[in-house]
A protein has these predicted regions:
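Intrinsically disordered, low-complexity acidic regions enriched in Pro/Ser/Thr
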Residues: 1-190
């Protein structure tokens, strides 16, 4: 299972969006610390294995034992991915510049070229690398997790869980889940 560090303020969004954007969530009153990241997958036949949910919970808590509440936020997706990020690292090029590309080069080599010299575009390129260059179509860095969004773009439901007045869990539902979904436990050694 992969872990990340979250602060008291968290962004749940497609990483292509700048702040503020109407179809993202900025959640305050988060219990800071280490969080476990899980991706739930499902075999969608001709679509292949797809990510149906992203679940991020405070380490030591069991997601199935939490009470999840639907939020009023629509998590819009236009780049085929969404994630949970500590506010201070969101679209922060300086925060992510030491992270290497998975295959040693940008996933956009020979294709789309991010807008150079625009704040957040280097960070966005690294988020795309995590979803485009991994078998899981998902990945983490120290303060965030990003995953491909099921079958693609759309508007998705965000749930949160709280304990003692603090948010301790986030769940993005890509609207594909049912009882046959499989939990993908990432190995920290990847």
């Amino acid at each position: 299972m992969k872990t990340i560090q979250l602060g008291e303020k968290v962004v749940v969004s497609d990483p292509c969006y700048e702040l503020p954007t109407w179809c993202q969530a900025v959640i305050e009153n988060v219990l800071p610390g280490e969080y476990d990241c899980k991706v739930i997958t499902k075999d969608m036949g001709m679509w292949g294995i797809r990510n149906t949910e992203l679940i991020v919970t405070k380490s030591g808590l069991v997601p199935e034992l939490l009470t999840w509440e639907e939020t009023p936020f629509d998590i819009g997706v236009d780049s085929g991915q969404a994630g949970v990020f500590s506010f201070e690292s969101y679209r922060n090029d300086n925060h992510i510049k030491e992270v290497q590309f998975i295959n040693g080069k940008s996933p956009f080599d020979g294709g789309y070229v991010p807008k150079e010299n625009e704040d957040g575009e280097g960070w966005y390129e690294k988020m795309c690398d995590l979803t485009l260059s991994t078998d899981e179509s998902a990945g983490t860095y120290d303060q965030g997790v990003v995953t491909s969004s099921g079958i693609g773009d759309g508007s998705y439901v965000l749930y949160t869980a709280s304990k003692e007045g603090k948010v301790v869990g986030f769940k993005v539902d890509f609207l594909l889940e049912d009882e046959e979904d499989e939990e993908d436990d990432w190995d920290d050694e990847d």
